[in-house]
Amino acid sequence: MKIALGCDHGGYELKQFVMKTLENLGYEYENFGCYSTESCDYPDFGAAAARAVAEGKCDRGIVICTTGIGISIAANKIKGIRCAHCADCLEAEMTRRHNDANMMAIGAGFTGKNMAERMVEVFLTTEFEGGRHERRVNKMMALEQE
């Protein structure tokens, strides 16, 4: 499984930690930036990571900014993306089980390294349940055609 990563300056340090976490867990990743703590714009990097997932170049994505909110909104503007802002492991698990989220957004200003590490592992190992949830996901995805 290959993971797309993106962040802004507020998420840079946590993204560096997430890259090490992915390496330790044996996942391949592609880093779509940013590449320093210099001020930058989260839509650029959230969208780049989301495009890689939407185009099938990466299987899932993790994006990070200070709150996780802005970068998740940017990622969700890309057709085919279901990016969930997650603050804990239960949210990371349930968004995979019930929403088949293909991206997760993390708020670096509110999420410590230990929590982020556990969230990444849960997000990447939890399977979609399908069933009634598949019907709901299909309805969400149909909204993109409106």
What are these regions (language model features)?
Residues K2-I3, C58-G61, G80-R82:
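Short active-site oxyanion
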Residues G6, F32-C34, C86:
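Conserved beta-strand termini and adjacent loop/short-helix elements that scaffold enzyme active sites
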Residues E13-N24:
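Short, solvent-exposed amphipathic alpha-helices that sit
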Residues V63-I64, I69-G109:
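Mid-chain, well-packed structural core segment of small domains
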Residues E28-S39:
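A short beta-strand-loop structural module common to alpha/beta enzyme folds
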Residues K2-G6, G10-G11, C89-E146:
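C-terminal binding/interaction regions
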Residues F45-V63:
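Short, structured active-site "lid" loops
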